[in-house]
């Protein structure tokens, strides 16, 4: 078996994927296996009893939103009795930031990979709620539920109608341009969100709707510097899924956290998760909060690093250090270090500060274990209690043991 050839095949599929944002649809209509009593979440599999505060809160909010329960107590009883199922977004071609909770009637972005060569595939992500009290951080007040209903009845349909007129938005091209404008695609999405708004605005203006709804949607998108994060995550999911299931490949195709555990998936080991307790991110905190308030790492957004952006592209986004900590030199060094554990330089994602060198892409579990260098991840930091919200942002690395577990499983499977 030629491992290098397998890895070359996998990383080529990842880089040559061409994810197009083509529409918005109800989760139950498009996500494989979705049904009314299934709640999807970020990270590897987890039972209700082990869920951290933010994830529990988001699950309660989703049950209230779906009217599976009418009070917090009813939602908790339903969860404890097994009346609802909890499964990872990743196992349903889906990703979501922070808690990542996605339920049947929620509208989701549809991202179709339309590569020039190779097989197409599709990925999904929920819509971004903006800032403040939001479901993804475990809030479930009436204010949160009202915003979710507005997103389902106004925001989603309006954006969906605009996308139907667009012929699709090329997200690979959008990400590539944003990297040349100071974004890294995970914690800093200011340029990408403006490019997203620029593409949508003329089309939204043509959508028929209630008086004022177009301007309401444009303001909501314009005020949210994370508006493009969810489509970008779905794009990265489409890219990494294109590389999943290559026999003999040692490349990582998912890194995901549920607030309790950190899990990875490996291309040549389909159907398996390798997990260990998630670390607590270290970074800068908003006024009034400290490291003691932080929940362990949570969210599917590390799919960005898995695809070669985010923490792997920090050299493109020196200003991010004002948010996650460190200096511009640290941002540059973070990217340089990641070349040590990856198999390729991205053909389409390049960084001006490194003479337009391609971002480090294709995490190789062999290199991670051999060198003792774990991937770098930029991340928001959630409060450990449900509903408090984001309390800061910083950096985190996966526990090394999961790469060791994966390498041992690989050796066993392939008789090495």
Model-derived features: positions:
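Anaerobic metallocofactor- and corrinoid-dependent redox/one-carbon enzyme cores
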Residues: 1-416
